Amino acid sequence: MKCRVWSEARVYTNINKQRTEEYWDYENTVIDWSTNTKDYEIENKVGRGKYSEVFQGVKLDSKVKIVIKMLKPVKKKKIKREIKILTDLSNEKVPPTTLPFQKDQYYTNQKEDVLKFIRPYIFDQPHNGHANIIHLFDIIKDPISKTPALVFEYVDNVDFRILYPKLTDLEIRFYMFELLKALDYCHSMGIMHRDVKPHNVMIDHKNKKLRLIDWGLAEFYHVNMEYNVRVASRFFKGPELLVDYRMYDYSLDLWSFGTMLASMIFKREPFFHGTSNTDQLVKIVKVLGTSDFEKYLLKYEITLPREFYDMDQYIRKPWHRFINDGNKHLSGNDEIIDLIDNLLRYDHQERLTAKEAMGHPWFAPIREQIEK
């Protein structure tokens, strides 16, 4: 669908316009692949996805644990994009931490001398990016099979299905604040993640460490550009993707974040459980209501696909309807309800930004810890 009503991000709108082309032009980037595959040893397989297989391994000379993501045959452009984004996120020098509710920009440093010839930092070099973004260590290609692989830091992750139900109220606030810091950082770098979900948030609970991983669907944000809506996993897709509105922005990540948060707070996994993309939108409308949905469609002049023509009318469901004896220790306060309500909005322009969310009263205990 061709967008009839244009929309642009409320924050970090022209970041990539202010950069040199080398920063975001991944199609013309030259990748300097290493062929030193003997530096690493694969120990066991830990996961697989549509575009890759993931293994745990070790760097032989230092015995440092690593993760090796072996890429399946895909378009070279997609591989270049992921590597360019990861190296951009790793190479930027992050200023000293400032509190998110201050008026100054959380991250303001700009770097214009990005090299077109990409080689990520290796183990003995300092990492300049944000701590909560997974660290890319190396890019290698087997000299015989030509299979490309990305080498990342290892995170002693606890599966979210096991971890999330055990987290205390304060721990949920802490980890979600850490995730917002990662999102605000990548957005400030002109990058949308486009696949925020529990599976892509690694948490080392013992060391209270969080990493946002899997940047294979991430993309640089440019004003007035229309993007592919076949991104994000079904349960975390924003309404804009489900109605084929292509001029979306960073706020897509905040919808996904909001669904994660609602799932953790209400102990309902996933929060919107559609059986197809069509049903996913119906599940959202059943909660947020038909009235606001129709206002959203009208504002952006969106015509629904034919399969939605016979959609029933639904009254908006109050958030307190999701509170029960099993979750009221997490959900039973107005602040968390207000935060979720301001994230899960049809209209992407109305959603809180990552920085705004960090300044929400629900995160006050976390901000107070930072001040100390």
UniProtKB/Swiss-Prot annotation:
SMART domains: S_TKc (SM00220)
Keyword Amino-acid biosynthesis appears in the UniProt entry: no
A GO molecular-function descriptor: protein kinase activity
Protein keywords: ATP-binding, Kinase, Nucleotide-binding, Serine/threonine-protein kinase, Transferase
Sequence positions that bind ATP: 46-54, 69
Ranges for domain Protein kinase: 40-363
Active-site residues, as the UniProt record annotates them: 195
Disulfide-bonded cysteines: none
Catalytic activity: L-seryl-[protein] + ATP = O-phospho-L-seryl-[protein] + ADP + H(+); L-threonyl-[protein] + ATP = O-phospho-L-threonyl-[protein] + ADP + H(+)
Any single Gene Ontology cellular-component annotation: small-subunit processome
Matching InterPro entries: CK2_alpha (IPR045216), Kinase-like_dom_sf (IPR011009), Prot_kinase_dom (IPR000719), Protein_kinase_ATP_BS (IPR017441), Ser/Thr_kinase_AS (IPR008271)
Family classification: Belongs to the protein kinase superfamily. Ser/Thr protein kinase family. CK2 subfamily.
Other facts: Present with 7180 molecules/cell in log phase SD medium.
Protein name: Casein kinase II subunit alpha
Annotated organism of origin: Saccharomyces cerevisiae (strain ATCC 204508 / S288c)
Record lineage: Eukaryota, Fungi, Dikarya, Ascomycota, Saccharomycotina
Gene assigned in the entry: CKA1
